[in-house]
Amino acid sequence: MLSTFINRIGERTVSLAISYYEMMLFTSLCILNILNPRTYNSEMATHLMTQLYQTSIKVIPHFILIAAIFGSVVIGLVIVIASDFSLQIQVGSLIVTFVINEFAPLLSVFFIAYRFSALIHREASFIHFDGEIQLLHNLIIPRILSTVLSTMALSILFSMIMIMSGYLSVFFILGMDLHTYKYLVFSSLNVQNIFILLIKSSLFGSIVAIVALYNGLHVLKPKHNASKIFVILFFIEFLSLFIQKVFNAIQ
């Protein structure tokens, strides 16, 4: 019985290692094609615009509502915690760091993953079923690019909406006027925050698309998407926090 258990663990470990290795090869192939100028043509551009409409423009009303609700609640919690620790003067820095660097990319990619991961998986399954893997340039690459661009755009939109809706929390909790709130937020905002937002959202978006496409092409169940996506996202989030701490320590 013990030997059977050990064999199962070994088989599972080898299977996971092979799966992640093949996914890395698939990722490398996609990156090489994205960087190849020959990939881009009129047909590919048409598919890209269609995918962008489906993954970003079409869902903006729902996303704005979610961002406004979460913005008021989350920033309210940040302000309450700041008040408890007498950090009112650093409210702007806390809001900018928490919203732009951490919360906006994560919530945006979770929204994209929840709405479109299964759809991407089904599309890839149909491509596999129809034997149309050769249409990498016109189907797979546009889907990856559209997911990346949509995640970046929604992250920026989410940050703006959260910061604007967060003023309500600041006003009711601290009684802060709009001019002071704008000064604290904009004085805390810098190029590094925008850079981190764009890098994180682009990485997160590419992970969602590549994992869903890979599982679809290999006819894996959609539930495999979520587990792989969450593991990779939280690893990147932890790594980014570590890099930020090291960077701040060096400065």
Regions found by a protein language model. Name each.
Residues L2-L48:
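Short, membrane-interfacial amphipathic segments enriched in basic
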Residues T55-L107:
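Active-site cofactor/substrate anionic-group-binding motifs, chiefly glycine-
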Residues R122-I144:
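Short cytoplasmic-facing helical segments at TM-TM junctions of multi-pass membrane proteins
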Residues S56, I60, I64, L139-I163, ...:
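Selective transmembrane-helix segments that form parts of the transport pathway or gating/packing helices
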Residues T39-L48, Y53-L65, K228-V231:
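Membrane-interface helix starts
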Residues L77-I100, V148, L157-S202, V211-N225, ...:
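Membrane-interfacial helix-loop-helix connectors in multipass membrane proteins
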Residues L239-Q251:
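Juxtamembrane boundary at the C-terminal end of a transmembrane helix
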Residues G92-H128:
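Hydrophobic alpha-helical transmembrane segments of multi-pass membrane transport proteins
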